[in-house]
UniProtKB/Swiss-Prot annotation:
<keyword id="KW-0964">Secreted</keyword>
<comment type="subunit">
    <text>Heterodimer with subunit B; disulfide-linked.</text>
</comment>
<dbReference type="InterPro" id="IPR001762">
    <property type="entry name" value="Disintegrin_dom"/>
</dbReference>
<dbReference type="GO" id="GO:0090729">
    <property type="term" value="F:toxin activity"/>
</dbReference>
<keyword id="KW-1015">Disulfide bond</keyword>
<feature type="disulfide bond">
    <location>
        <begin position="19"/>
        <end position="25"/>
    </location>
</feature>
<feature type="disulfide bond">
    <location>
        <begin position="5"/>
        <end position="28"/>
    </location>
</feature>
<keyword id="KW-1217">Cell adhesion impairing toxin</keyword>
<feature type="short sequence motif" description="Cell attachment site">
    <location>
        <begin position="41"/>
        <end position="43"/>
    </location>
</feature>
<feature type="domain" description="Disintegrin">
    <location>
        <begin position="1"/>
        <end position="62"/>
    </location>
</feature>
<dbReference type="GO" id="GO:0005576">
    <property type="term" value="C:extracellular region"/>
</dbReference>
<keyword id="KW-0800">Toxin</keyword>
<dbReference type="InterPro" id="IPR018358">
    <property type="entry name" value="Disintegrin_CS"/>
</dbReference>
<dbReference type="Pfam" id="PF00200">
    <property type="entry name" value="Disintegrin"/>
</dbReference>
<dbReference type="InterPro" id="IPR036436">
    <property type="entry name" value="Disintegrin_dom_sf"/>
</dbReference>
<feature type="disulfide bond">
    <location>
        <begin position="37"/>
        <end position="56"/>
    </location>
</feature>
<keyword id="KW-1201">Platelet aggregation inhibiting toxin</keyword>
Length: 62
């Protein structure tokens, strides 16, 4: 299937888009800083998006 965020010729996000896929990417844009991207397993220390990357960095307290 064709990804609407991706320019298939150069395999990069289309002009005006931030990202193609990832846990902190939705509708071709980075999710806002502070958006939970990985729920904690009982300790309450969730992992959060940074707003500048598609990665979901691990909480430093995990």
């Amino acid at each position: 299937s064709v990804n609407p965020c991706c320019d298939p010729v150069i395999c990069k996000p289309r002009d005006g888009e931030h990202c193609i896929s990832g846990p902190c990417c939705n509708n071709c844009k980075f999710l806002n800083s502070g958006t939970i991207c990985q729920r904690a397993r009982g300790d309450g220390n969730h992992d959060y998006c940074t707003g500048i990357t598609t990665d979901c960095p691990r909480n430093r307290y995990n």
